[in-house]
Design a protein with these regions (language model features):
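Subset of outer-membrane beta-barrel
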Residues: 6-7, 11-201
Length: 201
């Protein structure tokens, strides 16, 4: 005699700090938010830090501002600043900050009573290191400090809300082939793997 039972549990999933998934640069945003294996650029800290080791010597920085869902709400935006510096031929460091503003929000309780106003915001600081492990292969690490304050410390049912703070890491690898020729043009192919936002929720 055998009795087999199964149970399925469905629960709503909640994503913490979803602004971390918003593309901070127009190039990757226009390509459908791809970036793990695209050619290296100053925004590689967000998509795959391992690519930083393949950037030219010296350094560069970028500043961007992106209105977010502006046809729905006029004052939500993502601001981003990032830069990198090559330490030598095989390694690079980078740093960046993303600031997400959710505009002005009026808070009410369950009965619709006014509780106050606040400009919710979230930000993340990134610090990255990338190194070539061979002529064609590299690895990278990003350390992040994440801050999210969506309520401004208002009181809900007698309890004061608090900002969320967390640390996270990204791990990435990148392989870039040697240059070869196709129809008279120099070409390369690349593979990239990036595991992002490993940390507490």
């Amino acid at each position: 005699f055998c009795l087999v039972g199964s149970e399925m549990c469905i629960r709503d999933s909640t994503t913490a700090v979803p602004f971390l998934t918003i593309s901070p640069d127009s190039r990757s945003g226009a390509m459908g938010d791809v970036g793990a294996a695209t050619s290296p650029d100053v925004h590689s800290i967000h998509w795959n830090s391992a690519k930083l080791a393949f950037l030219p010597s010296g350094g560069s920085f970028s500043i961007s501002y992106t209105p977010w869902l502006s046809k729905l709400v006029p004052d939500i935006s993502l601001s981003h600043i990032t830069g990198y510096y090559k330490l030598n031929e095989i390694s690079a460091v980078a740093a960046g900050m993303r600031y997400f503003s959710l505009g002005n929000i009026q808070f009410t309780n369950d009965q619709g009573e006014y509780l106050g106003e606040y400009d919710p915001n979230e930000y993340v600081f990134d610090l990255a290191y990338s190194m070539k492990l061979s002529d064609n292969f590299s690895a990278g690490l990003v350390m992040k400090y994440i801050y999210s304050n969506l309520t401004g410390g208002i009181f809900v049912e007698g309890l004061q809300t608090e900002a969320g703070k967390s640390f996270a890491v990204d791990l990435g690898t990148y392989y870039q082939s040697k240059t070869f020729e196709i129809s008279g043009y120099d070409s390369q192919w690349a593979l990239g793997l990036n595991i992002s936002n490993i940390g507490s929720k």
